[in-house]
């Protein structure tokens, strides 16, 4: 018992220590670029010749274990930057990236046509980057100074860029060339910084293009799901049903609201089985007129609805209060009713 209590206390102490450690590490991300530990190694005494006491015979020396003397000229201590080289990200579907010198490139498929250049310009304008020169015919522009703000820098950088879109074989190349780079007002030209801040701008553009593509896809899906076509059909046994042009997930999500519009209230549902129980109360003549459909002539009562998954379509089959499927004429009458309900 004592062992268990002691073990529990140790676990709690270890957990608290871990939380404090993570909090300390995340409080200032500048330390991600520095070697862990203190800088006592900078004060270490240099290597010295070994002097043996009088009368002691030392083994024969061997050059195999000699430590060479070096005169390092690189950065040490907090001046040492251990961050890996920055890499441009191919966030756009089907794209790839490359980096050469001071230029980062994003190669995308030609399918975007003439929309790529306006999208690149829109990304920069959305970020409020000032454009000093712009040639839409040549699809090239030059920015004013872009101020960067990174937590892993002691002094912030700013850069001027030339950005262009050019055909390259069967692809289009979005190119970012770093024209000037400064840190705290002083010019910077080291390879690591040039790569990091060329890549910084490229990744901003890449993320913006990816967001545009995602927004366009979502808008297209919303348009498709807003106007879902409804048709009369029959199942494998010849019983009437409705077929909605829309995937099961979309139809299932929109069904309760659509049913409510036609006078059917959902009282129970099981998504995994595609079952719904609804109570039907016919609408008034004015409500049918407002919906834009005619009264299908169904009797009041409790109905069961079976929703089927037909890949990019869904089936709706109603069972009346007496346990029978709807007649063909009743099913056909519901086509216009649900077409109107899904469209509103």
Curated annotation (Swiss-Prot):
Q: Where is the lipid attached (N-palmitoyl cysteine)?
A: 25
Where does the UniProt annotation locate this protein?
Cell outer membrane
Q: Where is the lipid attached (S-diacylglycerol cysteine)?
A: 25
> Which controlled-vocabulary keywords does the entry list?
Cell outer membrane, Lipoprotein, Membrane, Palmitate, Signal
Pfam families, from UniProt? Lipoprotein_18
Instruction: Specify the domain of life of the species encoding this protein.
Output: Bacteria
Annotated disulfide bonds = none
User: What's in the domain note?
Assistant: Contains two well-defined domains connected by a flexible linker. The C-terminal domain may serve as an important protein-binding surface for interaction with other Bam components or substrates. In addition, contains a long unstructured N-terminal region, which is required to stabilize the BamCD complex. Only the N-terminus of this protein is observed in the Bam complex in X-ray or EM structures, most of the protein must be highly mobile.
Q: How does it assemble?
A: Part of the Bam complex, which is composed of the outer membrane protein BamA, and four lipoproteins BamB, BamC, BamD and BamE. Forms a subcomplex with BamD and BamE. The Bam complex has the shape of a hat, with the BamA beta-barrel crown in the outer membrane and the periplasmic brim formed by the BamA POTRA domains and the 4 lipoproteins.
What is the name of this protein?
Outer membrane protein assembly factor BamC
Q: Species name for this entry?
A: Escherichia coli (strain K12)
């Amino acid at each position: 018992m004592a062992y268990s209590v002691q073990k529990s206390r140790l676990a709690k102490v270890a957990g608290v220590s871990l939380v404090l450690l993570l909090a300390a590490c995340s409080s200032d991300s500048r330390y991600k670029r520095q070697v862990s530990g203190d800088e006592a190694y900078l004060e270490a005494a240099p290597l010295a010749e070994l002097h043996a006491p009088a009368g002691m015979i030392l083994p024969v020396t061997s050059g195999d274990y000699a430590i060479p003397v070096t005169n390092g000229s690189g950065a040490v201590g907090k001046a040492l930057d251990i961050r890996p080289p920055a890499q441009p990200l191919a966030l756009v579907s089907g794209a790839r990236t490359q980096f050469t010198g001071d230029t980062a490139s994003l190669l995308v498929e030609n399918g975007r046509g003439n929309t790529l250049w306006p999208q690149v310009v829109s990304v920069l304008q959305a970020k409020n980057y000032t454009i000093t020169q712009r040639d839409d015919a040549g699809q090239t522009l030059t920015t004013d100074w872009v101020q960067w703000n990174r937590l892993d820098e002691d002094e912030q950088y700013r850069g001027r860029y030339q950005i262009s879109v050019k055909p390259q074989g069967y692809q289009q190349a979005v190119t970012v060339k770093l024209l000037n780079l400064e840190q705290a007002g002083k010019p910077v030209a080291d390879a690591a910084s040039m790569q990091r801040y060329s890549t910084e701008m490229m990744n901003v553009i890449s993320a913006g293009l990816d967001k545009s593509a995602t927004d366009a896809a979502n808008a297209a899906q919303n348009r498709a799901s807003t106007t879902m076509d409804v048709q009369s059909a029959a199942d494998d046994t010849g019983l009437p049903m409705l077929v909605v042009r829309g995937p099961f997930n979309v139809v299932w999500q929109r069904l309760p609201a659509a049913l409510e519009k036609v006078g059917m209230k959902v009282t129970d549902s099981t998504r995994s089985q595609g079952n719904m129980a609804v109570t039907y109360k016919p609408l008034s003549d004015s409500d049918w007129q407002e919906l834009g459909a005619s009264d299908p002539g169904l009797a009041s009562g409790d109905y069961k609805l079976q929703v089927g998954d037909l890949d990019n379509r869904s089936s709706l089959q109603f069972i009346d209060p007496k346990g029978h499927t709807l007649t063909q004429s009743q099913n056909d009458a519901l086509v216009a009713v649900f077409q109107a309900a899904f469209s509103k």
